[in-house]
Regions:
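Short pre-active-site segment immediately N-terminal to the catalytic Zn-binding motif
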Residues: 51-70, 85-92
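Active-site metal-coordination segments of metallo-dependent hydrolases
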Residues: 83-98, 106
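Long, well-structured alpha-helical subdomains associated
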Residues: 102-166
Length: 169
């Protein structure tokens, strides 16, 4: 498994690949995804209104950072729907979303700074990592059941290898 992750890390994430990923996620997870400038001091946010799920990501960051933020906000979309939103503290919701981003990011070969964020969210609270991880792993399974990542990643690797081979000519 670790060899697969190291191999995936060779993917050169570009804006076009980010758009392919976003389109796949948007379709599979029933969420509108927008990359645009965000004036507030946040990198992205998830919004549910009028029966529509929306994720906004600040497009002024690197492509890998945008993907990381997209995955964090997608964690909110999957884990924090209207029914269970009030049952969880803000700290727990943020820790869950960041944990989701970390696990799925690893599948994409993206290093997320999740470790820096997860523990501070829950320090000084009664939130237990075990409880967070149970919910996160269910959410990751839900994501993996709906989003066809393997063909997408395989095509990215093939494309990058083809480009590398063309450069050698």
């Amino acid at each position: 498994m670790n060899e697969d992750i190291e191999y995936i890390k060779t993917i050169d994430y570009t804006k076009s690949k980010l758009n392919i990923i976003a389109n796949e996620i948007s379709s599979a997870m029933n969420v509108t995804i927008k990359f645009e400038p965000i004036k507030e001091a946040q990198l992205g946010y998830y919004n549910y209104s009028g029966g529509e799920h929306k994720i906004f990501v600040d497009n002024s960051m690197s492509v890998e950072k945008q993907l990381s933020v997209l995955l964090h906000e997608l964690g909110h979309r999957i884990l924090h729907n209207r029914e269970n939103e009030l049952d969880k503290s803000q700290a727990r919701r943020e820790a869950e979303a960041e944990s989701f981003a970390y696990v799925v990011g690893q599948q994409f070969g993206i290093d997320t700074p999740s470790g820096e964020y997860i523990l501070p969210y829950i320090q000084g609270t009664d939130v237990k990592l075990k409880d967070i991880f149970e919910d996160v792993f269910k959410a990751v399974k839900n994501f993996n059941d709906k989003v066809q990542m393997k063909p997408m990643i395989t095509s990215f690797i093939k494309y990058d290898n083809d480009i590398d081979n063309m450069k050698k000519l």
